[in-house]
Amino acid sequence: MSGKNEIINEKEAVMVQTPVLTLTKPTVEDGAAMWQLAKSSSLDTNSSYKYIMMCEYFDDTCIVAKDGDEVVGFITAFIPPKQQDTLFIWQIGVAASQRGRGLGLDLINKLIEREACKDIRYVEATVTPSNKASQALFRKLARSHQTDCQVSSCFSEQLFPGDSHEQENTFRIGPLRS
């Protein structure tokens, strides 16, 4: 080599193949990885028990994205007993390596296609005013389903102990199906 920088033209470039992710129901074994992913992000971190419990008792309404055996994304969600037509999304976690690729939207869409969600007409989540990424995701979900996204006040900051939690606003997307 002559010491000069070599320029490789596009014809000589090596194709980089992005891995295909598997979107599936979580198992209790996935709970710890979901907790770790939440802990390594800006999400509110719940106890590891919460993630394991969601995998055990709410697996029909939760989903994980895996790259091989590694959990790189998840949603914890449930159907509120008094709102059987609504899927409430508690958390969406996406690994830094997967952000900006539409994984959050893919996870939601795959989740609402499940048999357990066949009667779901609305998706709800609470989002803080500073969480612009989640706000954009839920608005994009509404646009992709050509439906409404209504935002209303839910939990004021006065309800939270301490002084470091913003208010939570409800994002309600739907109706999803006629």
Swiss-Prot record:
Per the record's keyword annotation, is Magnesium included, yes or no?
A: no
Enzyme Commission number(s) = 2.3.1.178
Transmembrane parts of this sequence:
none
Keyword vocabulary terms for this entry: Acyltransferase, Transferase
UniProt GO BP: ectoine biosynthetic process
Family, as annotated: Belongs to the acetyltransferase family. EctA subfamily.
What is the protein's given name?
L-2,4-diaminobutyric acid acetyltransferase
Natural source organism: Shouchella clausii (strain KSM-K16)
